[in-house]
Regions:
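Sequence/structural segment immediately N-terminal to covalent heme-attachment motifs in c-type
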Residues: 26-47, 62, 76
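Terminal low-complexity/IDR "tail" segments
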Residues: 50-51
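Residue-level signal for beta-strand positions within conserved beta-sheet cores that form or flank
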Residues: 20, 40, 56
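Post-cleavage N-terminal segment of exported redox proteins
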Residues: 1-29, 73-74, 87, 98-106
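Generic hydrophobic-segment detector
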Residues: 21, 44-47, 67
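Extracytoplasmic electron-transfer domains, predominantly the class I c-type cytochrome c fold
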Residues: 54-106
Length: 106
């Protein structure tokens, strides 16, 4: 019986480590806060994790952008989206890129 319990524990541990999204990451949490409050991203963009349903910018769940693409768009602006280079630090831009790339690619 103990071997059975050990086996199930290992399966549980494996599933938690490799298949559940990591959301206790402080950079992830900072990025989420910026997305929702400071950057006003949620006003224009749809992202399930943020419970946002903006209709102006692209749906990030469908776009599934990587960090490089997000950093470029936030830093330089793209289309009707303005640049946030003067409003956010590079660390804040990287944090929001980290958050969006992980959330959109779940």
């Amino acid at each position: 019986m103990k071997k059975n319990n050990y086996f199930y524990f290992l399966i549980f541990l494996f599933l938690n480590l490799f298949f559940l999204p990591v959301k206790s990451d402080p950079i992830f949490e900072l990025g989420k806060t910026i997305f929702l409050e400071q950057g006003n991203c949620a006003v224009c963009h749809t992202l399930t994790d943020a419970k946002s349903s903006g209709q102006i910018g692209p749906n990030l769940n469908q776009l599934k952008p990587n960090m490089t693409r997000i950093i470029y768009a936030v830093t330089n602006g793209i289309g009707v989206m303005p640049s946030y280079e003067g409003q956010l630090t590079i660390q804040e831009i990287e944090a929001v890129a980290h958050y969006v790339s992980l959330s959109a690619n779940q």
